[in-house]
């Protein structure tokens, strides 16, 4: 491609509304342009990278045995009502009506559509397992779209759905897809981690997320320093402290703590560390058969934070997790929130593992402006149910027994789920088994954020000059910069000859033949992030050389003109060959 005939829409200034580096560089490099909040047009340069990501995803999915389909983006409400998600999904589901007043939605995901398709197409166990995928535009009406294509409302996603006769078959495909995702992210040149995850609104029994490690990541991911354990912060297990709980050493004492309503304030007032206290959080209980919901107390160590996903998934807790209001607390306990404690508490109590290991601790006295010191489980407060309620912290023991936990920031670019029969049962998707009996199919689903990968790669691969693309997804693998080619026929001819030679060898090449100053050309090529750059100049040609510089290199080097291709093949062995 000749730059003189190509849209090079680079910008010198960083847009004021671009918060993270990938958003800034995608705008400055001329990859995308904003249409409205969370909506972006992909310009030719950005689209080249996007298509390369799609190609790698498609190739690996095809290798796995999955079959490509393309489903409608607009979906009828009846399918979502059948699965029960029409009301459950919330505000992210963009609902609309056609001219006849019928309800539709713009699909954020396609479980319902694929289940409807397969229940009408597959009839026998002999047709299973089957895995179908698409690469398609999705829409989620994000409350606060931000970070460019990282958290856009409209985005491109690869979503796949597998169907099975039994859980064992699902397990096998799940393993295949896990490896397929690793193959994809390896080929994309990303530093990533697969981690155990919560299934969220999609549902299902088991799931893994794939995170690109980046300081700008919105998610916290946890992994062992010495083992294979890895999970996101929502799923990471906080193991119980080792050893027995210490024996009581203090007597229970009530202390006046006027105006002290937070853990930090009480700790400072009493002169003791927060880890020697507990905090009591009251949440709504699961409704009984009459539809009435009481309260449940969650007890954590004072320096720990509640993991809301863990709590919400516990039996007896209302979903979604709902904190009790001040009025509800005062009515049930008789005090304000800052003074609650587990001693003689008139509601069911669930104690976190770490809090259950404390002795001689501090807690609220269940009356305003008073706390208790020297509190001990069994003697002063009942402890009938212990659960993992908290977020892990760096340095915690790893659940696999190998080393301690490290916490990093990550960008989620993939997620795989074992759905089980959540959708197939609700929508009666079944086949006849080997005995001729009707059997509800087991399902899996597997998503990759294709457009998000582009931004995530930039978060990992950039410097002060711009993007540094991995060869596999660079919009162009090679740039040829001609210096004063519009004035020098020798330079123009040499540039054209090298351009054709590299193109015929299978490389994606950008020939920068623009009538621009050398500094402008170099700055644009570095901003765009093209991995390999050759400079053609009269001075170099007189010596029989070209100047070469890799995007990650500090130094330039002179290469004999007739060795340019062989040099490039060594520098980029995959290239386009």
UniProtKB/Swiss-Prot annotation:
GO terms for molecular function: aminoacyl-tRNA deacylase activity; ATP binding; proline-tRNA ligase activity. InterPro entries: aa-tRNA-synt_IIb, aa-tRNA-synth_II, aa-tRNA-synth_II/BPL/LPL, Anticodon-bd, Anticodon-bd_dom_sf, Pro-tRNA-ligase_IIa, Pro-tRNA-synth_IIa_bac-type, Pro-tRNA-Synthase_IIa_type1. One of its GO terms (biological process) is prolyl-tRNA aminoacylation. Keywords: Aminoacyl-tRNA synthetase, ATP-binding, Cytoplasm, Ligase, Nucleotide-binding, Protein biosynthesis. Its EC number is 6.1.1.15. One of its GO terms (cellular component) is cytosol. It is found in: Cytoplasm. Transmembrane segments: none annotated. It catalyses: tRNA(Pro) + L-proline + ATP = L-prolyl-tRNA(Pro) + AMP + diphosphate. Pfam families: HGTP_anticodon (PF03129), tRNA-synt_2b (PF00587), tRNA_edit (PF04073). PANTHER family: MITOCHONDRIAL RIBOSOME PROTEIN L39/PROLYL-TRNA LIGASE FAMILY MEMBER (PTHR42753), PROLINE--TRNA LIGASE (PTHR42753:SF2). Homodimer. Consists of three domains: the N-terminal catalytic domain, the editing domain and the C-terminal anticodon-binding domain. Catalyzes the attachment of proline to tRNA(Pro) in a two-step reaction: proline is first activated by ATP to form Pro-AMP and then transferred to the acceptor end of tRNA(Pro). As ProRS can inadvertently accommodate and process non-cognate amino acids such as alanine and cysteine, to avoid such errors it has two additional distinct editing activities against alanine. One activity is designated as 'pretransfer' editing and involves the tRNA(Pro)-independent hydrolysis of activated Ala-AMP. Belongs to the class-II aminoacyl-tRNA synthetase family. ProS type 1 subfamily. This is Proline--tRNA ligase. It comes from Marinobacter nauticus (strain ATCC 700491 / DSM 11845 / VT8) (Marinobacter aquaeolei).
């Amino acid at each position: 491609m000749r730059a003189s005939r190509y849209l090079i829409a680079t910008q010198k200034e960083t847009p004021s509304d671009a918060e993270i580096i990938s958003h800034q560089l995608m705008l400055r490099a001329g990859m995308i342009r904003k249409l409205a909040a969370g909506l972006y047009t992909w310009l030719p340069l950005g689209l080249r990278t996007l298509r390369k990501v799609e190609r790698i995803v498609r190739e690996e999915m095809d290798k796995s045995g999955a079959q490509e389909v393309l489903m409608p983006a607009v979906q009828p409400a009846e399918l979502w009502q059948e699965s029960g998600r029409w009301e459950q999904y919330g505000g992210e589901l963009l609902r609309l009506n056609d001219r006849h007043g019928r309800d539709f939605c713009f699909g954020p995901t396609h479980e319902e559509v694929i289940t409807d398709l397969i229940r009408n197409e597959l009839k026998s166990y002999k047709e299973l397992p089957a895995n179908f995928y698409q690469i398609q535009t999705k829409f989620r009406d994000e409350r606060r779209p931000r970070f460019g294509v990282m958290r856009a409302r409209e985005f491109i996603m690869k979503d796949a759905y597998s169907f099975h006769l039994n859980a064992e078959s699902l397990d096998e495909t799940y393993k295949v897809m896990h490896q397929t995702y690793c193959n994809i992210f390896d080929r994309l040149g990303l530093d990533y981690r697969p981690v155990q995850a919560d299934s969220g609104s999609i549902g299902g029994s088991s799931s893994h997320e794939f995170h690109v490690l980046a300081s700008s990541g919105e998610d916290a991911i946890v992994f062992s320093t010495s083992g294979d354990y890895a999970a996101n912060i929502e799923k990471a297990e906080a193991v119980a402290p080792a050893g027995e709980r210490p024996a009581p050493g203090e007597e229970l004492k009530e202390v006046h703590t006027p105006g002290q309503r937070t853990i930090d304030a009480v700790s400072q007032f009493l002169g003791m560390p927060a880890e020697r206290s507990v905090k009591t959080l009251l949440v709504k209980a699961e409704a009984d058969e009459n539809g009435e919901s009481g309260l449940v107390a969650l007890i954590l160590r004072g320096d720990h934070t509640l993991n809301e996903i863990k709590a919400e998934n516990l039996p007896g807790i209302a979903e979604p997790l709902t904190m009790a209001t001040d009025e509800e607390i005062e009515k049930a306990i008789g005090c304000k929130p800052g003074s609650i404690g587990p001693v003689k508490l008139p509601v069911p109590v669930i104690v976190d593992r770490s809090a259950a290991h404390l002795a001689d601790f501090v807690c609220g006295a269940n009356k305003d402006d008073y706390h208790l010191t020297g509190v001990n489980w069994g003697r002063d407060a009942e402890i009938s149910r212990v659960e993992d309620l908290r977020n892990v912290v760096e340095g915690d023991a790893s659940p696999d027994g190998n080393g301690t936990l490290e916490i990093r920031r990550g960008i989620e670019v993939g997620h795989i789920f074992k759905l089980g029969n959540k959708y197939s049962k609700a929508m009666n998707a079944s086949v006849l088994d080997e005995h001729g009996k009707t059997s509800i199919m087991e399902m899996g689903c597997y998503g990759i954020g294709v457009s998000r990968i582009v931004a995530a790669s930039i978060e990992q691969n950039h410097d002060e000059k711009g993007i540094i693309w991995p060869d596999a997804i660079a919009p162009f693998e090679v740039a040829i910069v001609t210096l004063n080619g519009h004035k020098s026929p020798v330079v123009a001819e040499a540039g054209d000859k090298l351009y054709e030679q590299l193109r015929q060898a299978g490389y994606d090449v950008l020939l920068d033949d623009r009538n621009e100053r050398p500094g402008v050309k170099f700055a644009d090529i570095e901003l765009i992030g093209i991995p390999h750059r050759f400079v053609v100049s009269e001075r170099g040609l007189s010596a029989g050389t070209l100047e070469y510089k890799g995007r990650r290199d500090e130094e330039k080097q002179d290469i004999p003109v007739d060795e340019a291709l062989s040099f490039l093949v060594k520098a980029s062995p995959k290239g386009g060959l």
